[in-house]
A protein has these predicted regions:
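Juxtadomain coupling helices with adjacent low-complexity linkers
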Residues: 2-5, 10-12, 126, 136, ...
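Signal-transducing coiled-coil linker helices
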Residues: 49-56, 121, 172, 190-193, ...
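… and, occasionally, acidic/histidine-rich disordered N-termini of signaling adaptors
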Residues: 169-338, 342, 396-410
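Short, low-complexity N-terminal regulatory "tails/caps" that precede and couple sensory modules
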Residues: 1-48, 148-164
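Short beta->alpha transition motifs characteristic of CBS
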Residues: 74, 81-99, 152-168, 298-300
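The conserved cystathionine-beta-synthase
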Residues: 50-70, 76-77, 95, 119-141, ...
Length: 410
């Protein structure tokens, strides 16, 4: 659709003929694309069009009508330095008003231009985003004129251009974070040891989350099993799960649970400066004897079913979450699993899931399910728990990440 105020003019009027003459004489043009390396603001220039300050308003309107995708034009002097900016919307609003065509028929561009806000075109995009944080929150397009190191005009960008760029960056980051997290935290996992059968499951509430679990075979007939929950959501939480994955991957039988926890706690504090914490349960299991060294880090979601009876498995000692206390001296407990027992480790996303009426799934419901199904093989028990959660939730959205590990000791 043509812009009002100019396209409705008689194309044979003297003003339009004069405008065409101005255009043919080069009063309006495009600067060359800026090819500066790196993530600089020049990359976001959505308009490279300029017009000389001595040009007529009609010449500007003619040029913009020929370039319908241009929303702003820089006004430059004879040294190619910007002296103003004209927005397409404001230009044609003025020309479209009553008597607007007559009012501006002899006017020059400076009558309509605004003083430009200048930004160096080699400035980092992220630095510009930081400086314009308040403007970005306003939700309206604000235009800025770019200049090179000599002050010459090199284009125009808007806060909308910047928001689109940042949105694309965020989308790519989330996609990368999701791939990274899924490489570390599998949606489904199964493991068969000498005397254990284990199934793991993790379903994120969003694209990325903060739940983590690991099952690792160690030398000497031992297993490492852990379930952790990172505070917060999103990319930051997924970054911490990557840290956890790296640490647990380096765990060996020569480690002690206590020394491992101390090192991991120190790293989380040094890296994330007490901004995030991690609850979790870490178990080192001797498959031959059934002896389990348990370190409960402010988590406590660990249940064991033996001969139809359900109890909470854990240490009497209390530990804070990882990343809270720089001087953490972890306490561990020892328990022994009997053949035929089942152990379930889970995150709070299981019991905190709500139905469409806002009622929680609750730990009591989980207890009932486990007491009735504790003798099932891990895969069947995992399927039953997943099905029951889905049935309970109904149309309600998944509230939090849901992660659990089911182990049967034979």
């Amino acid at each position: 659709m043509a812009d009002p105020g100019f396209s409705n003019l008689d194309p044979h009027t003297a003003q339009v003929e004069e405008a065409e003459k101005d255009l043919s004489e080069g009063v309006m043009g495009l600067v060359a694309p800026n090819k500066k390396p790196g993530e600089v603001i020049a990359k976001l220039a959505s308009s490279r069009m300029f017009i000389l300050q001595e040009a007529s308003v009609y010449a500007l309107a003619a040029g913009m009508e020929k370039n319908p995708g241009t929303f702003a034009v820089g006004v430059v002097n004879d040294e190619d330095k910007p002296v103003g900016i004209v927005l397409r919307r404001e230009l044609f609003d003025n020309l479209g008003r009553m008597y607007g065509r007559d009012l501006y028929k002899r006017k020059l561009v400076p009558e309509l231009m605004k003083t430009p806000q200048l930004i160096r075109d080699d400035t980092s995009i992220f630095s510009v985003a930081d400086n314009l944080a308040e403007e970005l929150r306003k939700g309206t397009s604000i235009y800025y004129v770019l200049v090179d190191g000599s002050g010459h005009y090199s284009g125009i960008f808007s806060t909308t251009d910047l928001l689109i760029y940042l949105s694309n960056i965020t989308a790519r980051d989330i996609s990368l974070a999701r791939r990274l997290q899924r490489a570390i935290v599998k949606e489904c996992f199964s493991f068969a040891g000498e005397r254990t059968s284990i199934v793991g499951s993790s379903a994120m509430a969003k694209e990325v989350g903060g739940d983590f679990y690991v099952v690792k075979r160690l030398t000497g007939g031992k297993l490492l099993i852990a379930v952790c929950d990172v505070s917060g959501k999103g990319i930051a939480a997924s970054l911490i799960t990557a840290v956890l994955g790296g640490f647990f991957d380096g765990y060996t039988a020569s480690n002690s649970v206590k020394s491992f926890v101390r090192k991991l706690n120190r790293y989380i504090i040094d890296t994330f400066s007490l901004e995030y914490f991690v609850t979790g349960i870490i178990i080192e299991l001797d498959e031959g004897t059934g002896e389990a060294t348990v370190c409960d880090l402010g988590h406590s979601y660990m249940l064991v079913v033996e001969q139809g009876k359900l109890k909470r498995l854990g240490s009497d000692a209390s530990n804070p979450p990882l990343g809270v206390s720089p001087k953490l001296e972890p306490a561990t407990g020892i328990c022994r699993l009997n053949p035929g027992s089942s152990v379930v480790l889970f995150t709070d996303g299981v019991v905190d899931q709500t139905d469409s009426s806002g009622h929680d799934y609750t730990e009591q419901r989980l207890w009932r399910l486990l007491k009735a199904s504790g003798g099932l093989p891990p895969q069947q028990l995992s399927t039953k728990l997943t099905t029951d959660l889905a049935s309970f939730r109904g149309d309600a959205p998944q509230r939090d990440d849901i992660t659990f590990v089911v182990m049967q000791y034979c």
